[in-house]
Amino acid sequence: MPSANASRRSQEKPREIMDAAEDYAKERYGVSSMIQSQEKPDRVLVRISDLTVQKAGEVVWVRARVHTSRAKGKQCFLVLRQQQFNVQALVAVGDHASKQMVKFAANINKESIVDVEGVVRKVNQKIGSCTQQDVELHVQKIYVISSAEPRLPLQLDDAVRPEVEGEEEGRATVNQDTRLDNRVIDLRTSTSQAIFRLQSGICHPFRETLTNKGFVEIQTPKIISAASEGGANVFTVSYFKNNAYLAQSPQLYKQMCICADFEKVFCIGPVFRAEDSNTHRHLTEFVGLDIEMAFNYHYHEVVEEIADTLVQIFKGLQKRFQTEIQTVNKQFPCEPFKFLEPTLRLEYCEALAMLREAGIEMGDEEDLSTPNEKLLGRLVKEKYDTDFYILDKYPLAVRPFYTMPDPRNPKQSNSYDMFMRGEEILSGAQRIHDPQLVTERALHHGIDLEKIKAYIDSFRFGAPPHAGGGIGLERVTMLFLGLHNVRQTSMFPRDPKRLTP
């Protein structure tokens, strides 16, 4: 007589066979073979951002990540994410989906990439948790293209939760080090996607605006023979049998191009600063947007060109990137960025007067500290209602050796900084174009003349008066969006404590 276990097994086997036979949808789901460019099908993949009520009733294919999944009886709800856009998808037992298919969909690991065929359906009630609120996708086929590991180093929902909400409701948030240690995952969040898409909207109009103004884009060396500004804050690298340095700035080469009659130049490239500054706004490597321009009579001609370029960028961001701005503001609320036309320009002595009136004690030739910069930004906002302004005529003592002195006041200089929300984003000046004067100033700063001989020599054969400045891309992005740490706007940040990933 057969045992009870044997009898049970004999009953289960036909049931398994029957269940398999009932899986009428087995060809409609599964794990796809690895894509190795074996074929090029005619299948058209639709962007999630294009899934609107106008497509209701259409059968579409979508490739996306599984953001969340929730099984409920004979159906499973998925949220499919594609960059900063997402849509709800429904897998329900019916003509196109079996119980096994619903179970398969419910067990797909978060962040896996899937190909989904489905019918776009208009919903009666808006889906508030998705960007595509008026439609959902009724799934007919689903295939895993690339599976994610079941345990994620961070949860994306936690990574986009506002800190205030986390504190008030006791819900999880993700700290900065965890984000940066797992940057590839963190960059998938809707906030990160929005930040870096907006950042690309800074570089493009910078290049386009200046090109339309007659500027020439140049590339300058990053490996140089001497500290580019004569300071100690440089990275030393082995260069065959000698030492070389990573450029702190393209400054000297921009000027040499002006001496070579390019007249107006700009460059976009990495800048290296060996500063042991673990602050919210300092990086050891960042992207510099640099401008240099010959002028006719006054360096303010250049100041106005730079300010106009930045204003054009701000206008473009506010016009073209409202979705991204709103996405970032959901997690990091901030007042809209304000600016004036023409740009407000104050002299350094006026700024000192405002600070002194607010109770700050400062000497006439003292540089602005970070707290005083921020205070000045608040005072300017209160008085002029702008987040963007220019500070002109800095003390000569706090500027680099190549800065032109003010002819009316030897303690001042023809130099300027530009500020956003009370923080400096550009430093610039009229450059000394006379070889004798630049030699005197270099000696005054203790710079070895032999190491900048090529630079000084470039002025010996006739040099036009010129000025320029350097902008930090990550800092502009941070301040435009009202963020509080430049690491949020650097894709893979480098600071004194971080060299990976």
From Swiss-Prot:
Q: Which UniProt keywords apply?
A: Acetylation, Aminoacyl-tRNA synthetase, ATP-binding, Cytoplasm, Ligase, Nucleotide-binding, Phosphoprotein, Protein biosynthesis
Q: Which residues form a coiled coil?
A: none
Give binding positions for L-aspartate. Answer: 229, 273, 427, 431
Q: Which residues carry this modification: Phosphothreonine?
A: 52, 500
Which Pfam families does the record match to this protein? Answer: tRNA-synt_2 (PF00152), tRNA_anti-codon (PF01336)
Task: Provide the catalytic activity annotation.
Answer: tRNA(Asp) + L-aspartate + ATP = L-aspartyl-tRNA(Asp) + AMP + diphosphate
* Residues annotated for ATP binding in this entry: 273-275, 281-283, 424, 472-475
- Which CDD domains does the entry link to? AspRS_cyto_N, AsxRS_core
Organism's domain of life? Answer: Eukaryota
Q: Which SUPFAM superfamilies match?
A: Class II aaRS and biotin synthetases, Nucleic acid-binding proteins
The reply to whether Transferase figures as a keyword in the UniProt entry is no
Any idea which residues bear Phosphoserine here? 249
Cite a GO CC annotation. aminoacyl-tRNA synthetase multienzyme complex
UniProt EC number: 6.1.1.12
Location in the cell: Cytoplasm
Annotated segments matching region Aspartate: 251-254
Q: Which InterPro entries match?
A: Aa-tRNA-synt_II, aa-tRNA-synth_II, aa-tRNA-synth_II/BPL/LPL, Asp-tRNA_synthase_2, Asp/Asn-tRNA-synth_IIb, NA-bd_OB-fold, NA-bd_OB_tRNA
Could you tell me which HAMAP family the record lists for this protein?
A: Asp_tRNA_synth_type2
Q: What does this protein do?
A: Catalyzes the specific attachment of an amino acid to its cognate tRNA in a 2 step reaction: the amino acid (AA) is first activated by ATP to form AA-AMP and then transferred to the acceptor end of the tRNA.
Query: Record's family?
Result: Belongs to the class-II aminoacyl-tRNA synthetase family. Type 2 subfamily.
What protein am I looking at? Aspartate--tRNA ligase, cytoplasmic
Q: Which organism is it from?
A: Bos taurus (Bovine)
Q: Which gene encodes it?
A: DARS1
